[in-house]
Amino acid sequence: AFNFYYEENLQLLRARGAELLFFSPLANDPVPEDVDGLYIGGGFPEEFAEKLASNEVSKQSIKAMIEKGVPTVAECGGFMYLTKSIETTEGMSYPMVGVIDGKVAMQSTLAALGYREIFGMNDNFLMKEGEVAKGHEFHYSIFQPNSLYPPAYELKSRFGAKRVGCILHSLIAGYVHFHFASNSKLVDNWINACLQFQEQKRNAI
């Protein structure tokens, strides 16, 4: 359900000293213990919506981690999973993690496709104001928010610009897939946020 990651992203995270631990919401796994960061990538959660909806261990574990302030990046399918629900093209609605106040509705036609320039906004932990990276969008769903969130970035393409992405706690979530090799500063930013979270945990003991 969440199997799309640019391999360069994982390589760059490892090169900066990150230890990557894997778990599967489809298998109802909890988030590995004592993590300092969380990465939920893209995929097709709508194809596994019923199974994901029933896997409460994974959903509650992820929600708890985000609410604790674990620096989290969620891209496309991962973003969809963190909303309150996914509605299929058949009109069936399945409850998801529920951290983001809104739902996702699937369409039979593409909602977005193509490469994007990404401009950081609101000095979020991943992209500071003025930092630029590249990535892409590819999705058939639309997000219908119930609450307003500060936009994490501005996307520019040949069709124009839009301010999107959600900032919530230490969560950056949206449809765009980041390509960290386009600006490795994003990796440094994320690693630093994870180290700060790790230090906060130590100080709380």
Where are these predicted regions, by residue range?
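Glycine-rich, charged/polar anion/phosphate-binding loops
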Residues: 21-27, 82-84, 119-123, 158-161
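Conserved active-site and cofactor/substrate-binding residues in soluble primary-metabolism enzymes
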Residues: 4, 8-11, 15, 57, ...
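Amide-donor transfer/coupling interface in amidating biosynthetic enzymes
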Residues: 106-205
